[in-house]
Amino acid sequence: MEAEGRSERGKQKKGRLCGSLWPDSYPAAGTLTSTVDVSPQPSKNLSGVGVRRPRLSPQGGQRGRLHSRRRHRTTFNPGQLEQLETAFGRNQYPDIWAREGLARDTGLSEARIQVWFQNRRAKQRKQERSLLQPLAHLSPATFSGFLPESPACPYSYPTPPPPMTCFPHPYNHALPSQPSTGGSFARPHQSEDWYPTLHPPPTGHLPCPPPPTMLPLSLEPPKSWN
């Protein structure tokens, strides 16, 4: 009996100590378990009411980026394009002075003209590549069909003319020399008209040139200087 009384007293003391540890503001253990078992709806509401960070939709972000990267396109009138094309035909890489001169003539800025020349060079390179690309796939056999067939004898060479025979010139006969009083033969007088006549010679024959004139030697014996 005494043991049972001691155990009851110990339980009462433990109950008093637990009561002193729990403050009056906290509910009892039974009520605490009941308040913990609540539905998740209040937590959703609290999360909805809580502070949210501003989030941008992907479409809105892309629109902002496109708007920041958007460039202003420059429209050229026919007169400006004609002047630019003429300058491009003269020089595809103009320097700063040429670009400034074009800027004054066309009324555009130097930066716009520089960008136009860059785009024009890229366009020309693209056109050249598009023209050369179909030719690269063709084989040499395909080109042979476009070439004309060579005949058996493509060229006929004329036969060489017969050798020309020289006829004696009408003035080539020897003229008699006349002795002079000075003891020496005088040089025979030749006609200045030794050239052939104006009539053309026979075909395939040319006159021979006249022989050189021979000077006659003196017939007198040499005189002694004694």
UniProtKB/Swiss-Prot annotation:
One GO term (biological process): regulation of transcription by RNA polymerase II
Compositionally biased spans, kind Basic and acidic residues: 1-10
Protein name per Swiss-Prot or TrEMBL: Homeobox protein prophet of Pit-1
Regions of compositional bias (Basic residues) in chain numbering: 64-74
DNA-binding region(s) from the entry: 69-128
GO cellular component, one term: nucleus
GO molecular function: DNA-binding transcription factor activity, RNA polymerase II-specific; RNA polymerase II cis-regulatory region sequence-specific DNA binding
Subcellular location: Nucleus
Classification lineage: Eukaryota, Metazoa, Chordata, Craniata, Vertebrata
Main function: Possibly involved in the ontogenesis of pituitary gonadotropes, as well as somatotropes, lactotropes and caudomedial thyrotropes.
Predominant location: nucleus
Taxonomic source organism: Canis lupus familiaris
Keyword Zinc-finger: no
Start-end of Pro residues biased regions: 198-214
Swiss-Prot/TrEMBL keywords: DNA-binding, Homeobox, Nucleus
